[in-house]
Amino acid sequence: MIISAKFITSLVVKFDENLSSNFSEVAFLGRSNVGKSSLINSLCKQKNLAKSSATPGKTQLINFFEVTCKRNEEKFNINFIDLPGFGYAKVSKNLKEIWNQNLDEFLKFRTSIKLFIHLIDSRHTHLEIDVNLNDYLKRFLRPDQKILKVFTKCDKLNQSEKARLKNEFKDSILVSNLNKFGLDSLEDVIINQTLGFDK
């Protein structure tokens, strides 16, 4: 379980090999307004740990959080990485190209990332931007890395819709920040996969 978390730093979107981590890391990715910051806050049980911008795509920062977990009375540290949302409408084309290139370098060369959490709005499960993101991650995924699909805002679905979604995406997790649905399951998967306890 996650017992504490703290903000470490914010970085402009670019790869810097000097900014390495001693901890295994979890990267949260998804399109703008999918609920990345809210999910991090819910998992860490802190309302304002990760702050979301009122204007999607306005912030070009990668935010790092040090998270302390406990498993069988033993404590471990991992980092959560809150990445800028994909698919911003209010960013110039040139800035978007630079942004995407820098994110590309960061994701490919950040070897401490062990788990990519791809957040998808449960009401819009087959958007082209999400299909492309999934394909993109698979192209450079290393043997020690995994992708986990997490469907957000599941409080908007009825039971049959949830069952249908879970049946289609069998290894995914459905969550709701509003009623805390699925958060315990997600927390367990994050800890086990990031620290290698699932092997």
UniProtKB/Swiss-Prot annotation:
Entry-linked SUPFAM superfamilies: P-loop containing nucleoside triphosphate hydrolases
UniProt-listed Gene3D superfamilies: P-loop containing nucleotide triphosphate hydrolases (3.40.50.300)
GO molecular function: GTP binding; metal ion binding
Pfam families referenced in this protein's UniProt entry, alphabetically: MMR_HSR1
Residues holding Mg(2+): S37, T59
Binding site for GTP: 30-37, 57-61, 82-85, 152-155, 175-177
Top-level taxon of the source organism: Bacteria
Cystine residue pairs: none
Functional summary from the UniProt entry: Necessary for normal cell division and for the maintenance of normal septation.
Annotated protein name in UniProt: Probable GTP-binding protein EngB
This protein's encoding gene: engB
